[in-house]
Amino acid sequence: MSFVIATFYHFVKLSNYYDMKDEIKAACDNFELKGTILLAEEGINATISGERNAINKIFNFLCSDYRLKDLTWKESAAKYQPFSKMKVRLKREIVNLGVSNLDTSLRGKYIDPDHWDDFISQPDVLVIDTRNEYEVKLGKFKNAINPYIQYFREFPQWAKSFSKNKNLKVAMYCTGGIRCEKSTAYMKSLGFNDVYHLKGGILSYLERTHNKNGNWEGECFVFDDRIAINSSLAPSNKIKCIFCSNQVSADELKSVSRGQVVCSDCNPS
């Protein structure tokens, strides 16, 4: 049996997000889906997995709410179910930047994955990776600036220190698009004018371009039991245990915390 992993988000005002939780959870359970959906007043953010027909059903169910008809939606395949349960959670933010009253509608301009390579090759463009340090270690775009943050909520402090460059053209990216979209809104609030971000993130870029120009270097960390994927969107075979340094497959995985992987031999309990 194969599974479809769907990752999606949308920044939109959901004033009744408290009331949406039970209905969405019931639909996911009915379709036998696993994963996590986050709801907040600022929108929805999720990664779920299930059979093809079930994913189609939840997509149609969510899009029946006019506020969710423009979901940023990406899919990949897995040979096993990467999640153990289905969770729908209420949050203050769907991605934790820690900035109150940020108007996410004032985000930067999208760059389509097919045009990303040409755009970032321009000499006056600074490329910024908005992900955490342990993610950047696995892979990044060539010449991208690494803010060396441990948590996304540390990004605002770094951005303020970078504000002397506010007259430059900035291109930002993340895994699936949500962090770079929110961070562009924050950069614009600091006075950056020429701000852009990769539509759909690294995952859409790899899916659309197959990394034909080799601008993506390394693996891409993902937040499920696959741990990381390669440029072909297949589970990576280059993840190593932090204790024995042996490569770790999904079957051998014992635990993972913020990119720190432990194999079953080193943690048999």
UniProtKB/Swiss-Prot annotation:
- Database matches in PROSITE patterns: RHODANESE_3
Keywords, A to Z, come to:
Oxidoreductase, tRNA processing
The record ties this protein, via SMART domains, to:
RHOD
GO-annotated biological processes = tRNA modification
- Pfam families the UniProt entry points to: Rhodanese, UPF0176_N
Q: Catalysed reaction(s)?
A: uridine(34) in tRNA + AH2 + O2 = 5-hydroxyuridine(34) in tRNA + A + H2O
Which one of the record's GO molecular function terms can you name?
A: oxidoreductase activity, acting on paired donors, with incorporation or reduction of molecular oxygen
Q: According to the lineage, what is the superkingdom?
A: Bacteria
User: Any idea of its EC number?
Assistant: 1.14.-.-
Which residues does UniProt mark as catalytic? C174 (cysteine persulfide intermediate)
Rhodanese domain residues: 121-214
Enzyme class name: oxidoreductase
Q: Does the keyword Chaperone apply?
A: no
Protein task: Catalyzes oxygen-dependent 5-hydroxyuridine (ho5U) modification at position 34 in tRNAs.
Family as reported in the entry's similarity comment: Belongs to the TrhO family.
Q: What is this protein called?
A: tRNA uridine(34) hydroxylase
Per the UniProt entry, what species is this protein from, by scientific name? Wolbachia sp. subsp. Brugia malayi (strain TRS)
Name of the encoding gene: trhO
